[in-house]
Amino acid sequence: MLKGEESVEFQFKEKYDINDLVEIVRILRSPEGCPWDKVQTHETIRQDFIEEVYEAVEAIDEKDAEHLKEELGDVLLNVVFHAVLEEEQGRFDFNDTADDVCKKMIFRHPHVFGNTKADTPEEVLANWDKIKMKSKEQKSVTETMESVSKSLPSLIRAQKLHKKAERGGLLPKSAEEMIDDISAGLARLKESLAENSADDNSEKIGDILFEMTGLAKALDTESEKSLYNACGRFIERFDKLEKNVGKAGIKIQNVSPDVVRILWENKK
C-alpha cells in the first residue's frame, strides 16, 4: 500500500497486469496524483504517442526483444492514458476499447470465426476490403481511399492509395513503365528549372515521389522503409567522411564546401 501524507490506495505486486496499468493511470490522474499527469489532454500527449510508436518500430528493426518489450509497454501506456481521459468524460473506458477491437477482429475474420472460405492471404485481403466497405458504409473505392488516414507519413499513405486503386480495378503498370514515367517527370522538372519557370515545382516533385511509391510497391518493397534505410546509409557515409577529415586534425565545418563535395563524391 502506498503511504504518505496524501496516500492513495494501491497494492504493490511482484507482477502486474493490464488492470493494474489502468488503475495506475487513474491514480496519476486523481487529485492526489501527479501534477504533470493531471493536466494532460489528448492533444498534449499526441506527439508522445507518435514518438513511442516510432520507437517500437525501431526496436522491431533492431530485432531486440527486450527493447521491443519496453517500447510496446510505452505504447500501451499511451493507449490506456487516452482511454482513461475518455473514461473521465463518461464516453468510454479501456474495456470498451478492448471490446470494440475484439468484435472487429471477429467480424473481419469470418474465415476463422464463421463459414467464409479464404485459403490464401490474397483472398483474406479481398474479404477484408469488402467487410470494411460494408461496416463503414463506403459505397465507392474513392471513399476507401479518402478513409486512409491523412496523419500517416506521406510515403506510407501513397503506397496504401496505390493498393486501394489496384483493388478497385486500376491495374498497376510494370516496374519498367513506372521507371519511364519517373524519368519523364524528372525531365519535366529539369526543363522547368532550365526555363526558370514559375510553375510549382513542389507539385512536380510530389508527382515523382508518388510514382516512386508505386514503383516500390511493384518491386514488393516498402517505400518508407527504403527511405529509412537510405537515411541510415547517408549518416554512415557522412560519418566516414567526417572521420577521414578529422584525421588531419581539421573539423569538417572548417573545410571549403567545394572540397567537402569533392571528398563526398569520391567516397561513393
Predicted regions and their residues:
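Flexible "arm" and connector segments at domain edges
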Residues: 2-71, 77-205, 209-268
